[in-house]
Amino acid sequence: MTNKMKRFTFCAIFALTVLLAGASNGVYNVRDYGAVGDGKTLDHTAINKAIEAAVADGGGRVVLPAGTYLCGSIRLKSNIELHLTPGATILAAPAKLKAYDESEVFGAPEYQDGGHTYFHNSLIWAEKQSNISITGHGRIDGEGLTKRDTERAGNLQGGSIGTGDKAIALKLCRNVTIRDITIYRGGHFAIIATGCEIGTIDNVTIDTNRDGIDIDCCKYFTVSNTKVNTPNDDAIVLKSSYALKKPVLCEHILITNCIVTGYKLGTFLDGSYVPEKVNWVCGRIKLGTESNGGYRNITIANCTCMWSSGLAFEVVDQGRMENIVVDNISMSHVHHYPIYITTGCRNRGPKERTEVSSARDIYINNVIADDCDSLAGIIVTGMEGHPIRNVSLSNIRIQYRGGGRSVTKPYREQGTNYPEPRWAGPTPAYGLFARHVDGLRLHNVDFELMRPDERPDIVLEDVRTID
């Protein structure tokens, strides 16, 4: 054998040894599968190859070293950890590259928004997978994702054909972890989990232009130590859509130690924290609006809301809302309302359903809020003949801006309307307005005004109170 052949043989053996070593210790570097990370070359095919290699070996950690990885759809599989090292960015490809997977076929899209219907046309997606995780101190930048919802108009890609509409989309998965990552510009939803069981979202930072985190028809999920800035939509929202073609409860959910805000897009991440000044600022923690099954056994604790709307709990699609516990919430510069609880009969679902939306056993304790909008105080409204039952408000102090005028026009019944107080106009009371409630308990509830308000502090209509 010549020296040249010996050198070639040695190099080949060395390369094979390195590759096998990577596989044997369960770590799969995407650079070894062709990823470039220059922000110009499409890298999702190489990343998917690394994932498939790990799957063939029974699973493992797929690592993205520092670099910018221009990507279309990445398909997450069972027993895979997608790990973004510091300095690694997954950059969503623009529509013109047509890099996203085709949307799946779905037979009943009329009962929920398109964002809840289609998953495969996302930047990172998984369906019917288990033991999956996305970790690391890297970033997902959804620059090429759309924030539009146009699927119901016949465009199944969510925007221009070929455009992804979600940063992370998980459906019918089990044992899910998303930890430490940052998401900037997450598309229609930065994270959506639908029909998933046993999940953890921890220490995640999101600065996006639509919903931050959507937990839909899921059970046994925890969202903790997470910061979400969403000036134009909901920050952390639980839903119960018809995306699984049947009513499914969202239940056994804990949201704790989180911060939600409504600053201008990008200013949370860059640290300038510029308040959004448009009329509609959201950034709230919400249950709804999709509520076919409803919500049960939900705890929200130790959270902060800043420059955003407050808490909204809505069941209007024939589901039920019960056993909701809220404790230790701090709010500052609150848009529209601090707390909103309502039932209604929008009934967005199959017409043959006969259930009536219901809510009961809602306990809200230890809430402090300052600089709240004068539009509305706390709102608790059921439906005539179908009251909300057993609502407890205790240890609550809210400071309102005041300046409201007397309200002579009857406040509208929720009925079939979309549940949004700003469309209903000012409430009859600046502090608390309740209607159709059976069992309202108030303990140590205090309202303050920054300037005089012509409305009374509390107005109750068709309400039975409990001492």
What residue ranges belong to the model's regions?
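Extended hydrophobic/Leu-rich segments
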Residues: 5, 20-23
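Bacterial N-terminal signal peptides that target proteins for export
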Residues: 2-12
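Bacterial N-terminal signal peptides
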Residues: 11-19
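Extracellular/periplasmic carbohydrate-active domains that bind, remodel
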Residues: 23-467
